[in-house]
Amino acid sequence: MRMSFYQFLMTQRNPNSADEVQQFANNAFFDTTFPKHSEDFDEISHYLEENADYLPSMTIFDEAWQRYIDAMN
């Protein structure tokens, strides 16, 4: 079974890191309304654009998404 993007993102958490994707993961962990079961780029992207004040740039999401795709293949 393929893991959701959120499940993958949680593997990227590191509270002591300056890596932007890891910071995104750290912040997403505290986002109680994040679409935790989604594997859909558009759904997650739309959610982040509308709700994630903690994400300074969608480029960070794009990088995290690429890591997710690479890990799933």
UniProtKB/Swiss-Prot annotation:
InterPro entries: UPF0346 (IPR010673), YozE_SAM-like (IPR023089), YozE_SAM-like_sf (IPR036806). It holds the Pfam family YozE_SAM_like. It comes from the Bacteria. Belongs to the UPF0346 family. HAMAP family: UPF0346. NCBIfam families: PRK13672.1 (NF010193). This is UPF0346 protein Lreu_0775.
